[in-house]
């Protein structure tokens, strides 16, 4: 055989291998699980708890301001992995800027994978197949950076097989719920038979601190963020009668908004994670979101809808002002953000886990109301993540009929 024909034969072999390795269908969400830590704090009394727990009750005017901030958030309650008795052991954490990173790490490093594993157990149970069939694990968090990392610890807690392909997404912030869905799509579609366990877990104690008159950004963060974890099972070519496909991940794209790096940024210091947010963040997001939407539709050869109300919506609830301005910019009816506002009210902003919670809320409500699809009876929708950078994750979803 000549060298030319031999090379051609090898190329055919490579192409055949490549084709055999890839799935036939689109990546699909097949199961969802969520988990909370045990301590529930009503938002209308959170200022009392926060100023008492941080030994700041003498800051009367600042407390009044913080209470007003809390009551404007449209949050009803939040969950945390700490209570007042727990925080008494850590006066360095409840101060504003005392060195406390070691203690925060000691709490988060075991706590994050443990909470994530709780959500994963629920997702695996709903999926209905043995955990030994999980081929990939994508774990996401913005706290508890360590080695071996949180993906390793979560896999160990779950008893996943030792050759699971693991990925850890650290320190991406609020847009990362979209990031992990983008990763899951690529993994599921490029590995035939893959079943990807996606886990997002967040603990706010990495950035909890006492109030300071000169740093209201952190006060705003303390009024918004809550603890939580969520998990998905994602795979292509679902097994009929065994797996329950809900949402197809048709397209996933990331966009960085130019000249917006200083709008939202966080920095890890000896005193924990410091939070900075410009008052321009709602306007920055709302002015750029439509371009991201148009891009994701055009990238798959679809014409963007003339009326954005024809879609179902899963935007990350960065805060009330962000939702209000995006809703106004896109001329959306108030009910379009119902699932997002429900999760914001029930749980606060849980960073990367939020959009997965909203996906769960939407599919459950759709089933309860007897609608035709998991996406509020609609066929097409979008999931949006917003976070530091400013970075936007735009996910085009196709909702399947309710089973």
Swiss-Prot record:
Q: What class of enzyme is it?
A: transferase
Protein residues bound to CoA: 281, 318-321
Q: What is its EC number?
A: 2.3.1.-
* Site residues, Determines the polyketide chain length and product specificity: 207
Query: Which Pfam families does this one have?
Result: Chal_sti_synt_C, Chal_sti_synt_N
Any one GO molecular-function label of the UniProt entry:
protein homodimerization activity
State the InterPro entries in the record.
Answer: Chalcone/stilbene_synt_C, Chalcone/stilbene_synt_N, Polyketide_synthase_type-III, Thiolase-like
This protein's record includes keyword Glycoprotein = no
UniProt keywords (A-Z) are: Acyltransferase, Flavonoid biosynthesis, Transferase
The UniProt entry annotates the active site at: 174
- Description of how the protein assembles with itself and partners: Homodimer.
Q: Function, please?
A: Catalyzes the iterative condensations of 8 molecules of malonyl-CoA to produce aromatic octaketides, SEK4 and SEK4b, the products of the minimal polyketide synthase for the benzoisochromanequinone actinorhodin. May be involved in the biosynthesis of the octaketide barbaloin.
Name of protein = Octaketide synthase 1
- Species of the source: Aloe arborescens
């Amino acid at each position: 055989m000549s060298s030319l024909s031999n090379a051609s034969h090898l190329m055919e072999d490579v192409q055949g291998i490549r084709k055999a390795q890839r799935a036939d269908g689109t990546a699909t969400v097949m199961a969802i699980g969520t988990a909370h830590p045990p301590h529930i704090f009503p938002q209308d009394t959170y200022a009392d708890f926060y100023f008492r727990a941080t030994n700041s009750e003498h800051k009367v005017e600042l407390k009044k301001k913080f209470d007003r901030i809390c009551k404007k958030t449209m949050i009803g309650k939040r969950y945390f992995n700490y209570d007042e008795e727990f925080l008494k052991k850590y006066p360095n954490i409840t101060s504003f800027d005392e060195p406390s990173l070691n203690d925060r790490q000691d709490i988060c490093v075991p706590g994050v994978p443990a909470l994530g594993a709780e959500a994963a157990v629920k997702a695996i149970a709903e999926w209905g197949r043995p955990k030994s069939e999980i081929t990939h694990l994508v774990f996401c968090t913005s706290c508890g950076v360590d080695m071996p990392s949180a993906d390793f610890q979560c896999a160990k807690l779950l008893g996943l097989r030792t050759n699971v392909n693991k990925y850890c997404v650290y320190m991406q912030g609020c847009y990362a719920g979209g990031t992990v869905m983008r990763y899951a799509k690529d993994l599921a579609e490029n590995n035939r038979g893959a079943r990807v366990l996606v886990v997002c877990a967040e603990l706010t104690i990495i950035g909890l601190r006492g109030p300071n008159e000169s740093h209201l950004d952190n006060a705003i963060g303390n009024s918004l963020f809550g603890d939580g974890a969520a998990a998905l099972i994602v795979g292509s070519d679902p097994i009929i009668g065994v797996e329950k496909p809900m949402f197809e991940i048709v397209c996933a794209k990331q966009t960085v908004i130019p000249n917006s790096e200083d709008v939202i940024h966080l920095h890890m210091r000896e005193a924990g994670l410091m939070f900075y947010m410009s008052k321009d963040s709602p306007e920055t997001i709302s002015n750029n979101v439509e371009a991201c939407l148009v891009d994701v539709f055009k990238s798959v050869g679809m014409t963007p809808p003339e009326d954005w109300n024809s879609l179902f919506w899963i935007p990350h609830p960065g805060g009330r002002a962000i939702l209000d301005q995006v809703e106004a910019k896109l001329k959306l009816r108030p009910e379009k953000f119902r699932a997002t506002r429900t999760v914001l009210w029930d749980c606060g902003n849980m960073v990367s886990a939020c959009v997965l919670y909203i996906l769960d809320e939407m599919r459950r409500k759709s089933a309860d109301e007897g609608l035709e699809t998991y996406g509020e009876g609609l066929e097409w929708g979008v999931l949006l993540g917003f976070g530091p950078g400013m970075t936007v994750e735009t996910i085009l979803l196709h909702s399947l009929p309710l089973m």
